[in-house]
Curated annotation (Swiss-Prot):
Keywords: Ribonucleoprotein, Ribosomal protein. One of its GO terms (cellular component) is small ribosomal subunit. GO terms for molecular function: structural constituent of ribosome. Pfam families: Ribosomal_S16. GO terms for biological process: translation. The keyword Ribonucleoprotein applies. NCBIfam families: S16. Belongs to the bacterial ribosomal protein bS16 family. It comes from Thermosipho africanus (strain TCF52B). This is Small ribosomal subunit protein bS16. The keyword NADP does not apply. The gene is rpsP.
């Protein structure tokens, strides 16, 4: 199964995360399929940069976000766009 999850970057005591698409059997910091953005929780306010179009594309293909990434993507407005696309597809099929 393909997951959207965080991979840790940065120095000791200064975490920085990439939001990546990865096979769930891979290691946390292992090879990934595609990078969707990054998240820096240390800055005040935190920095969240997500390529919304890529994230929507992967979710529509069936990629499952982890709990933390799901919350971050919700803050970035990704799921609103996914819901709109699903509604338009349902209307087209009728």
């Amino acid at each position: 199964m393909v997951r959207i999850r965080l991979t840790r970057m940065g120095k000791k005591k200064q975490p920085f995360y990439r939001i990546v698409v990865v096979d769930q059997r891979k290691r946390r910091d292992g090879a990934y399929i595609e990078s969707l953005g990054y998240y820096d929780p240390i800055k005040d306010p935190y920095i969240l940069n997500v390529d919304v179009d890529k994230a929507v594309e992967w979710i529509m293909k069936g990629a499952q976000p982890s709990d933390t990434v799901r919350n971050l993507l919700r803050k970035a407005g990704v799921f609103k766009k996914v819901d709109e696309l699903k509604r338009t597809k349902k209307e087209e099929n009728k």
